[in-house]
Amino acid sequence: MCSRVLVIVRGGGDLASGVVYRLARAGFPVLVIELERPLAIRRAVAFASAVFEGYVTVEGVTARRIAHTGEIAEARAVGEVPVLVDPDGASIGALQPPVVVDARLAKRNLGTSRLDAPLVIGLGPGFVAGEDCHAVIETNRGHYLGRVIWRGMAEPDTGRPGSVQGRALDRVLRAPCAGTVAPLAAIGDAVRVGGVVAMVGGEAVYAPFDGVLRGLIHPSVPVRAGLKIGDVDPRGVREHCFTISDKALAIGGGVLEAILSAPQLVPAPGAGARPADRPG
């Protein structure tokens, strides 16, 4: 069943990449569609990086940028995940996949509809299962992370990053002004409090505490003042910068469960509760 079910994933950031990784490892053909200049921060573990670099490998799964949908089969033939610049999602209508996953984490619906595919899955707040999609995956850290919601919504956006060793808002690096980012440190580098991590439009971006630079937006991406451009991890474990997070894998597991249990994809009379009857 898996090899016959094309899944289009909108977005290739680090959380979306946890989804792509889970699906690819389970044998599903996946197409990632992205912006011309993706806003991914944790680029070392984001399949969106293929847009900039041509290729990226995350924990043994390689993604390749393709120019058009006609190159999907070529990428799949060598075990690679195709990544297509398709900000408007035109490939969804052209390919008519059985599954669409909106993994852009925009905290609002950017136009995804239940009519996009037989199974449409939204990640996090901004979607209503049963209205604009078939299932929602909880993305908020805590007891319900990764849970499949068949009716209703995920927990609301708190506007606050998850706490890591007591650090929350201050672990996020933001652009002090509009411009492009000139990095002075690389992802995985150790940083010290007050050290300059990058420059934006001639203004310095400082490390808020000792740790490692877990993510930094690509230098070709124009940024506005206040935009999230980086992430410092106080745990200081370099390996974490290059491996998929527990959160991303939990969300990916939720998407995998939703696909495998959706009756519109796998009719199984008497196999258990229908999705609409499952607890949210």
Regions found by a protein language model. Give the residues of each.
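Well-ordered secondary-structure scaffolds
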Residues: 2-280
